[in-house]
Structures are given as structure tokens and as C-alpha cells.
Amino acid sequence: MAKKEININNYNDDAIQVLEGLNAVRKRPGMYIGSTDGNGLHHMVWEIVDNAVDEALSGFGSQIDVTINKDGSLSVEDQGRGMPTGMHAMGKPTVEVIFTVLHAGGKFGQGGYKTSGGLHGVGSSVVNALSSWLEVEITRDGAVYKQRFEDGGKPVTTLEKIGSAPKSKTGTKVTFMPDPTIFSTTDFKFNTIAERIKESAFLLKDVTLTLTDLRKEEDNHVAFHYENGVQDFVEYLNEDKETLTPVLYFSGESDGFQVEVAMQYNDGYSDNILSFVNNVRTKDGGTHETGLKTAITKAMNDYARKTGLLKEKDKNLEGSDYREGLSAVLSILVPEAHLQFEGQTKDKLGSPLARPVVDSIVSDKLTFFLMENGELASNLIRKAIKARDAREAARKARDESRNGKKSKKDKGLLSGKLTPAQSKNPKKNELYLVEGDSAGGSAKQGRDRKFQAILPLRGKVLNTEKANMSDILKNEEINTMIYTIGAGVGADFSVEDANYDKIIIMTDADTDGAHIQTLLLTFFYRYMRPLVEAGHVYIALPPLYKMSKGKGKKEEVAYAWTDSELEELRRTFGRGATLQRYKGLGEMNADQLWETTMNPETRTLIRVTIDDLARAERRVSVLMGDKAAPRRQWIEDNVKFTLEESGAF
């Protein structure tokens, strides 16, 4: 993405605006970083990295370095202009204002940035508030300055000059230690950070981003630099897929908006569009993504009409038909004056002008490409027509399910399989997808019949990564799930119509169980993704061990889910205890299954989330796709094989 020209002199103490004081961040951290688990911890990293990215985006600096230090703290260093070091109108050093006052930053006025991705400047102060300590080091105007904060953002030193530097050298380095009294974990994950900064490197093609982990001596450094930017990003997304087209690249500028699009078709059956605004991922899309989809649909339908692939009596194909098998990256720079997000987060762009700008640029250039590449274009239209036929079959299936018009075959699918809940309240009901008939029987007996439904999975679950929609609808197990959930499938899926609040996958704690989990998650990811994104899909966690001692009424019973918990039970029970290793769910009776795995008061559920769409896309493609080599490599790198089954995955 081309960089905006900005006057370096505009980024000074007067450019820092203050909207409100920093209040209650420590009391309600979830309002600012989403959560206090590992996701919230890494959100702190993104806030500081995004500020460094804003500097690079504005044309200042060619490298950003992220370092996980030996003591567990984390540093982000950029080559930007360096934060202003003078006094602010509030009577404090400007740096102190930036790190202690919420919404203090250079992104509200018209001088500091024309485009920015940081959360309107709140990031630095929020990170400071949620840290045990934070240090900022600034290189600017031939000098090096430093200030330290402790105990949730309290300045313990003033901004002081600690050295000199060449006048040509500028930048900011922020180091912080997350507060263990706030976060459930303070362990930074190397791979999580690497994937995120890799994404930023794709979008900043003139900038190198590095990550170093000083906690270990080997395999502790990665560097990312991509000369072709978003084109390289799309190639990365499709790396483990069979592609049908070269990477198409379109760019343009209008009304101060800069647009870049890279897209490529593969032989898969789902689409994967990643959109960004000012280098920040907009996972819920928005007006810019709508413009892209509209442009693709219009250009393709117009071409199909002109070439006779769609006859006069035929209806236009829908956008989802043309997006089947499409991987695309849309990156747009929006001027600060036009930047609007929907809601409190940056997940969805609301800027009205973005839609026509993207639509116009992509429509014109895609139309030209189609006319110049007739054979390829015709193949894409034929592929879309097949997608339409599959979509209409899926819609028919959903309508029949919703209206209760199941065929004899479909009624037979559910007959003797689904044990429904008594309640008809979709906001409270739970559906357990249970591996095998024996476990299904125990689950039926042990459940709370008021709100828990049981669907045993008897046959083989289809690998939907390798199947088209017609094959999916022919698979008995998948078809039964579609009818039971009741919200359609594929492009026609509507999460609001789901019959259950929780879809819970319950399998044995062995390799077969893990395989079934993976097959089901692949199906939900590809064909009911909104169900996952809305947090409705869970994995049940049955215990691995049962330890008992004594008999009759004096019998003591306890369960362990991990080997460390087992060792604790050994110490607690002492000699004379009996240990049972559960090989499968069927070994538990109904009461045990209820107590350990189904009772909302005592069970443990893992909610399935998609934190990084690009990473999830690659993982599904590698593990479930056609290419064996990358799957074998991933297993060798990530799975430890032992002689004794451990139940750890």
C-alpha cells in the first residue's frame, strides 16, 4: 500500500488531543481489550504494534521489531518520528499524557496522521493501565529520552534525557510487563504474535517486521518482508490448494481513498475474503467489503450475459456463486476525516464512501481482465453455475426443514437418532453430537431432558474440505445435522434460525475421537461458519481418569482431566485407591457422564473461536485438504508420538 505524505513537523506536542481521563480501565479491562485471558493479553501487543504500524503507514521507518524479553515483558520498537517530548497544554510532559490519559493521541486532529489503524490513540494508555510496569524510550531531535510507569500506569520517573543519538535516528520503543493480577496468563505466545505481524508485513510491503523470543536460545527469531504485498498474501492463503487462476491484482485511488485488491480462485467450495482498513483487520467486513463483492458479482454477470453463458431467460447468479473458491485480500486506506466504524470496535467499516470507491475501481479492472482472458473467464462462469445449482439444493433442504416438510427419507434420517429436548426455546437448548451409539445411550439417560438434545453419530462423518455441496447433502450424518440444527447450510445458512444455543461435540479422548472432532469442526467452519463466529460451537471435555476408594456409602470418587490432576489425586487418595483410565465415553454410566461432562454446574466446555481467520484457513486446508506433504510436515512439527496413549492433543 502506498504511503501518505505527511509533514514531520505536524507531529508535535500540540498535535496530541485529549478527550477524557483514564478511568476504570483496571476495574473493567474487558471493555478495552475484550477479555483478561490469553486473547486480551495479546490484544495489548496489537495495540502497541498498531501504533508502530501507523508510523510506517505514514511513511516513517522501514522496520518494526517485537521482542519477548527473558523476564516475560515485551518490547515494540519502531523507526517512526518518536513521540513528542515537550510539555503538553495540560502542564505535563506529552509522553506522560499519552500513557496516562485515555483517548490522548495524535489521531484525532488533522496534523499527526492522515490515516491510522490504532484504536484512536487509546492503546498506549490502556496497555499502561494493565501493566505492572511500562517503560517508553524515545529517540528524537538528537537525544534519547526515557520514562517509567508502575502499578497500573503511575509515573515513577519524569521524562528524562538519558543519552544522545544522530539527528537522523528517530523512533519509539515501548516495553511493558502485563499485570498478573489482571490477566489469567501472562505468557506471550511466539506463534500467535508471529502470525499477526506476518499479516502486517503482507500489508506493509516496504516494511520489515521481526519477532525475537529471548526466553529460548533456538528457533527464537523470525523476520517478515513481502515485496509484492497483498499478492503475496493471497498466494500464502492458497499455498496448500489447487489454484485455477493467477493472482489478479487491482489498485486505485479516489477521493483520498487508496484501494488494493488481490484475488485468486482455487478448486475449493468456500470463499475466503480478508479485508483491512488502514492495516487493521475488519473481520465483520463493512462498506469496503460490500463494494468488492458487488463489483465481482456485477462484472461476472455482465460478462456472462455478453458471452451468452447466461441466457435471456436465466436469472443473474448470486454473489455467493461467483465467490465459491475465491481467496481475496482487500486493503483500503481511509482518510481520517472519512473513517467510521460500526460499534465500539474496529471490526466493521461504516464509511459510506468506501463502497462506491471500491466498487468502481474493482468493477472496471475486473471487467477488463475478463474480456482479455475469455477462456479463463468462461470457466469461472461455469464454475459459478454449478455453485448456483448446489445452492438451490441446499436452500430447498433448509426450507423443508424449517417448514416441517421432511421427505420420508429425511424423516427416516431423524427417526431413532435425535432425542429432542422438551423445551422449544432455541436460546436455552443444547445439542450434543455424540460419538457412537453406546455413549449416545448413556447421554440420553444422563441428560437433562428439559433442554439437552442428543444426536449420536453412527456412520462416518464426511471430510467436507474435499466435497462439493451435492456430496455433502448426500452424506447421512451431515444431512442429519443440517436438519437438526435447522438453519440451512453454506451461503444459505442463517445463524438466527438455529434451534440450539450450544452445539456440543462429545467424543472419546483418543485419536479416533480427535479425528471426528476435526471433521465436524471442518464442516462447521466451511458451511456454518457464523455458528462458530457467534460462539455457539463447543467441545465437551470428558475426564481421562476415575479414582475411587472404599465401598458402598463410604466410597470416595474423584475425576482427573490431566496427568497433573491425576498425580494430585494419587497424593490425596494414597494407597488402596482404584484407578480407571477411560478409553471411551461408553465406559461411563449415565450418572457419571452427567456429573463430569453434561451438568452445566460441573462440566468443562471448550468454546471454539476463530481468532485469526488467515491462520484458521491455512490450518483447515493443511489438515483436511488433498495435499499430503504439508499435512505430514505439520504432524512432524506439532505432534509428539509416544508408546503409551496419553490422551493429549
Regions found by a protein language model. Name each.
Residues 54-55, 82-83, 511-512:
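Residues immediately C-terminal
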